[in-house]
Amino acid sequence: MAAAPLKVCIVGSGNWGSAVAKIIGSNVKTLQKFSSTVKMWVFEETVNGRKLTDIINNDHENVKYLPGHKLPENVVAVPNLSEAVQDADLLVFVIPHQFIHKICDEITGRVPEKALGITLIKGIDEGPDGLKLISDIIREKMGIDISVLMGANIASEVAAEKFCETTIGSKVMQNGLLFKELLQTPNFRITVVDDADTVELCGALKNIVAVGAGFCDGLRCGDNTKAAVIRLGLMEMIAFAKIFCKGQVSTATFLESCGVADLITTCYGGRNRRVAEAFARTGKTIEELEKELLNGQKLQGPQTSAEVYRILRQKGLLDKFPLFTAVYQICYEGRPVTQMLSCLQSHPEHI
């Protein structure tokens, strides 16, 4: 007898979550391995007097977070988290990283023991020994195997089906290949590697570098300066991974889409860069700019810089990571944006 088709639930429905829902909803229609209905947990909000879940289920568009892109009709928005994940075999986590503890606590025990997860969440947490990855939190709280997906993937471009690459990191290769089958399309090409921790760390740390790039744009420094931010940021990303990742760190992973490609696209086209540029030019706070420019969605770069700053301070390593440190101090300690240039001029890479 053929195995029952695998039920998929997407946990999250923001900009990126909705773009991924478009891919998965379309793919499962022709893949017999997966159930043809995809549930998507939606944090209920009211938009123009209507519930967001009603809009998605009737008009098949997330008008708040991914306007202008139709979702397949087999993607069903569910406002109740427990109901959304019930009996799901495959969980796709795509929420702001600061909510992962609460979400895991709420759904642990409600999914089958053999369920598999993949996290698209770009962020890290602080643990007693320093670094704690989002995948570690999910694995420890829920007891399921978890893969990661990171890459040069601006959500609106993915939703518009413009060509891009991405990277899946999975410690169990067959699980990574299963998620590749679920997610790959002719215009969304996936490489699977086993260096999962490095893949995940790239996705978090590049947002800090992008904030630095945005500061430089706000100061009108030019392309040469931004190239230096990208290079020095990459050096700090590699150094951080080699210090804090428990397993082996392959430098080759930084050449995958999750590494240098994602870093470049985020430093030129992402929301972290855009908000950081506005921060440098307007003097408004990050919180004000989130409301103004991001429809209230949370920016990951500044928050990740705060977590990284605490981890580095705990280990006495702040002076080894001047770019990461400068981003935190400018965002949260009121240091002038020009400190970004000072940190580049005196970077230990040049000494």
UniProtKB/Swiss-Prot annotation:
Disulfide bonds: none
UniProt-listed GO biological process terms: carbohydrate metabolic process; glycerol-3-phosphate catabolic process; NAD metabolic process; NADH metabolic process; positive regulation of protein localization to cell surface; positive regulation of sodium ion transport; regulation of heart rate; regulation of ventricular cardiac muscle cell membrane depolarization
InterPro entries in the cross-refs: 6-PGluconate_DH-like_C_sf, 6PGD_dom2, G3P_DH_NAD-dep, G3P_DH_NAD-dep_C, G3P_DH_NAD-dep_euk, G3P_DH_NAD-dep_N, NAD(P)-bd_dom_sf
Binding site for substrate: 122, 271-272
Record EC number: 1.1.1.8
Localisation: Cytoplasm
Active site: 206
Pfam families hit by this protein: NAD_Gly3P_dh_C, NAD_Gly3P_dh_N
The protein's assembly and partners: Interacts with SCN5A.
Its job: Plays a role in regulating cardiac sodium current; decreased enzymatic activity with resulting increased levels of glycerol 3-phosphate activating the DPD1L-dependent SCN5A phosphorylation pathway, may ultimately lead to decreased sodium current; cardiac sodium current may also be reduced due to alterations of NAD(H) balance induced by DPD1L.
Listed NCBIfam families: glycerol3P_DH
Protein name: Glycerol-3-phosphate dehydrogenase 1-like protein
The organism of origin for this protein: Mus musculus (Mouse)
